[in-house]
């Protein structure tokens, strides 16, 4: 008799919530259905948008007979890495001028986080420091916890961020957690357009955060998934990172080009490393090269070529900034329209937070039972946390969504 399958005892893993939501939406035959869960940009026709500048560059690449399919270097396409780091740190960055910046091309922002996490677990402030506390905001993007856990970190803690009552930043709680964290702890910070709350510190608040972090020797690991997409202004969205660098911090920054280039399935990311001197950055990169070699070995070329070609050409760069602003402006419009409708309906509660938050997501303040009502009764799909993607709203479904939220809030406590 043959033995049972060696996989017989493997338990079924729960589905990834945001992708299950999209699958449920797709299978729903109801014509009223609205998907507010998807983590990607949509046009006013609810369609994905390929940026015109990306189409143009793809055509140029297709017609360039000098290009081939040879392996890229382990750390990635050199032009892409330097352009990506320059985009986040700025053209006049002192750190770049002093050659103490490095980049690692990664498989999206998640890949950048994972390479950074693996490196920190092995080499941060000594060797094999997986007991170093990792602090992530409460709430945060669910993958932050998962990535650092998978990298072997044993002590992952939340820090205060969201004040549910006032629907804004809990600055005092945040500062208290910084003060009480063990020295040399690692803090994962959202550079802009905080996911899921859409609430960012102001520049003055960032200065207070940086001052405590510097005094307590805390290490900033920025996640920058939305540069340009948050406010429509590339410089403004990178302000926090640039300020930390100007204050002399060593830091990591995981960058994603999924949202601001619309290159979701090309997996284009970069891990920017800022050190105190060029020698240490070179040593860091040498160790990251070893980590990449056993992770994906060599990154893909197409997305990196598109980004590098766009960022290095003044005309294409200008066109790209216009494309990004188109996306950011549509989101801002949807925010103000949704708020106006809820206020016109006299929906209980305050709704000013919808326009005060920025980026793709809004933390509505809806509770899980109200969300359940919207999903089951109204066929409006959103996460149990009440997070909605503003891009799921269109001029055609705004009224329906607003009246449905009004019903949920008035009927269900």
UniProtKB/Swiss-Prot annotation:
Single GO MF annotation: L-cysteine transaminase activity
Modified residues (Phosphoserine): 149
Expressed in which tissues: Expressed in neurons of the retina. Localizes to the inner and outer plexiform layers, the inner and outer nuclear layer and the outer segments of photoreceptors.
Cofactor(s), by name: pyridoxal 5'-phosphate
Entry's transmembrane regions: none
Classification via InterPro entries: Aminotransferase_I/II_large, Asp_trans, NHTrfase_class1_PyrdxlP-BS, PyrdxlP-dep_Trfase, PyrdxlP-dep_Trfase_major, PyrdxlP-dep_Trfase_small
GO biological process, one term: response to transition metal nanoparticle
Pfam families in the cross-refs: Aminotran_1_2
Activity control, per UniProt: Inhibited by calcium ions.
Known EC number: 2.6.1.1, 2.6.1.3
Modified sites of kind N6-succinyllysine: 318
Location of the protein in the cell: Cytoplasm
Residues that, per the record, bind L-aspartate: 39, 141, 195, 387
N6-(pyridoxal phosphate)lysine modifications at: 259
Keywords: Amino-acid biosynthesis, Aminotransferase, Cytoplasm, Phosphoprotein, Pyridoxal phosphate, Transferase
GO cellular component, one term: cytosol
Domain of life: Eukaryota
Primary role: Biosynthesis of L-glutamate from L-aspartate or L-cysteine. Important regulator of levels of glutamate, the major excitatory neurotransmitter of the vertebrate central nervous system. Acts as a scavenger of glutamate in brain neuroprotection. The aspartate aminotransferase activity is involved in hepatic glucose synthesis during development and in adipocyte glyceroneogenesis. Using L-cysteine as substrate, regulates levels of mercaptopyruvate, an important source of hydrogen sulfide. Mercaptopyruvate is converted into H(2)S via the action of 3-mercaptopyruvate sulfurtransferase (3MST).
Annotated NCBIfam families: PRK09257.1 (NF006719)
Similarity remark: Belongs to the class-I pyridoxal-phosphate-dependent aminotransferase family.
Miscellaneous notes: In eukaryotes there are cytoplasmic, mitochondrial and chloroplastic isozymes.
Assembly, per entry: Homodimer.
Protein name: Aspartate aminotransferase, cytoplasmic
Organism, as annotated: Mus musculus
Gene name, Swiss-Prot/TrEMBL: Got1
